[in-house]
A protein has these predicted regions:
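Short, surface-exposed recognition loops and adjoining beta-strand edges that mediate ligand/DNA contacts
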Residues: 72-94, 171-177, 181-183, 219-311, ...
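Membrane-proximal, proline-rich intrinsically disordered regions
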Residues: 22-78, 257, 478-507
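Short, solvent-exposed loop/beta-turn-alpha elements that line the ligand-binding surface or hinge
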Residues: 89-114, 181-194, 285, 319, ...
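Conserved, well-structured interaction surfaces
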Residues: 46, 50-51, 55, 59, ...
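Flexible, polar/acidic helix-loop-strand segments at domain edges
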Residues: 177, 330-385
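Bacterial Sec-dependent N-terminal signal peptides
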Residues: 1-33
């Protein structure tokens, strides 16, 4: 839909005052009725009619995090693990094989869905953030309530924007709810529905600003409810944001990681299996609110996740949908890495073998599956302490503080019942950097981190361009990885709707 503005403006004028944002060819939010609590009484922002409406809108954000598993978790696993050396696509479908073969193009339908969903989530957060400003200005909400809800909304928005920044490099920065279009203002207002993509620095500055607001005003960390946007959640995300190339500041990574590590009630689970375990007697996950969880999404009987059966058997219903090839199949390269390390503790919680009726990548009678989401009742972790400890280790290594980095890595290895790093793994700066990256691979496999680790450390070409020689079971790589591979293509559907967007280089 190129030149959408020029080709539709006459029709919009004809619609006159009855034409609203809901009628646009491009819908910034999926349904305004979902996002606007109360009525729209001006042309500036959606109105939250009272405090109760604001509380409902905040609840909506948490429900999006919980229920929209496609872009909040599943597709990040595909990008993070299938697009790296951790996993194969698993099926022959176009949803996953392009990631395995480095052939993702702008027509990829799931990438298009993710772009639209992320913008929809940002729009929902903006309704809360802007609506709270109105309520606060009118004295309809207390100072404490205003800051607490505002902080949670901004953490949510920044989480969405950070995902977009890591996938596409940059995105259209939208912080306001668009005005209602009328015949009188259409030429001025219509372009605001189609903003250009901002530069990466601008995107990251807003992400940092939102997380810093959350760090100041969000609720304190609650050990008995780790599903909430808390100060510790904001600090953890800041540690990860400052590790990225655009703003890279290793001292700040250490600063915010230390805030997280020193949070009372936050510590590594003594047993790795507790994070992922299934209790067959109670037909439930082993534990919610695990001691190392910073932000998790929880599921219960009657309200389970569906994502588990995308990867393997869902243990609460053993044979459910186990009749088609599953996604994110563990790679030979990853399994070999675990085995070389002698890391049975984590391997056995990361990979499981079943008999199945397909043999896409392995013999059907001994087929490996991703095991970190093994039932519809297991937690999905958005942030956990081991990740932040290893982010700090990475930063210490790049700062030249090698012993500090080694100590942190050994802390993670100890929980996995592995010996401390051998002397050859700690002898040089590069050896320590390699050891941290390797430890992150084993600790965080199938948590959607590996691809982003390689991008952040600028090691994509090193690990991925020789992957077919290391891993004979992988589909052929169709294109070599290069400097343009670090960002995925902006979906063609988004470009068609918005002439102000420009495609990422190389696509």
């Amino acid at each position: 839909m190129n030149n959408i503005y020029s080709t539709t403006i006459a029709a919009l004028f004809a619609a006159s005052l009855t034409f609203t944002a809901c009628s646009l060819d491009y819908e910034p939010v999926s349904e305004l009725s979902e996002l606007t609590q109360g009525s729209q009484t001006d042309t500036t922002t959606a109105v939250l009619k009272d405090k109760s409406a604001a509380q409902d809108q905040l609840k909506t954000l948490y429900e999006k995090l919980r229920n929209r598993q496609e872009h909040w978790h599943m597709d990040l696993n595909v990008i993070g693990d299938v697009h790296s050396d951790n996993a194969y696509g698993g099926t022959t479908g176009a949803e996953v094989t392009p990631y395995e073969q480095n052939a993702v193009d702008p027509s990829h339908k799931n990438l298009s869905r993710d772009w639209d969903r992320y913008l929809d989530d940002i729009a929902a957060a903006n309704v809360l953030i802007n609506g709270l400003d109105q309520l606060h200005a009118k004295g309809q909400i207390s100072e404490t309530e205003y800051h607490s809800m505002q902080a949670q909304g901004k953490i949510f928005r920044a989480m969405v924007m950070f995902s977009m920044a890591r996938i596409w490099g940059a995105f259209p920065v939208i912080t306001k709810v668009a005005k209602t279009i009328t015949a009188a203002n259409i030429e001025k207002v219509y372009p605001t529905y189609f903003p250009p993509k901002s530069d990466a620095k601008t995107c990251y500055e807003l992400i940092v600003s939102d997380f810093k607001y959350g760090l100041k005003y969000a609720p304190d960390f609650n050990t008995s409810d780790r599903t909430r946007m808390s100060k510790t959640v904001a600090a953890a995300w800041l540690a990860k944001v400052y590790a990225e190339q655009t703003l890279q500041d290793y001292n700040k990574v250490v600063q915010y990681a230390d805030m997280v590590i020193n949070t009372p009630g936050l510590k590594l689970e003594p047993k790795f299996e507790t994070l992922w375990g299934w209790n067959d007697k109670t037909k439930d996950c082993v534990k919610r609110n695990t001691s190392e969880s910073i932000l998790e999404v929880q599921y219960f009987t009657g309200s389970t996740n569906w994502e588990s059966w995308m990867y393997g058997r869902s243990l609460e219903n053993y044979d459910f949908f186990f009749n088609w090839a599953k996604w994110v199949t563990p790679s030979r390269d990853l399994i070999a890495d675990f085995e070389r390390e002698g890391d049975t503790e984590r391997l056995n919680q990361t990979v499981v073998y079943y008999n199945c009726t397909w043999s896409n990548y392995y013999p059907a009678n001994h087929y490996p599956f991703m095991y970190k989401l093994r039932s519809g009742l297991n937690n999905v972790y958005k942030l956990r302490l081991a990740d932040i400890i290893l982010m700090k280790a990475e930063s210490e290594a790049y700062l030249g503080n090698l012993q500090q980095a080694v100590t942190l890595v050994n802390q993670i290895r100890h929980r996995a019942k592995l010996a401390p790093l051998a002397a050859d793994k700690t002898a040089t700066s590069q050896a320590v950097k390699d050891a941290v990256l390797h430890e992150r691979r084993l600790e965080l496999a199938f948590e959607g981190e590996r691809w982003f680790d390689l991008v952040r450390t600028k090691r994509v070409e090193e690990f991925m361009n020789g992957i077919n020689k290391r891993d004979k079971g992988r589909l052929p790589q169709l294109y070599p990885f290069n400097e343009y591979s670090y960002r995925l293509p902006i979906p063609q559907t988004a470009l068609d709707k918005n002439d102000n967007l420009k495609q990422n280089p190389g696509y």
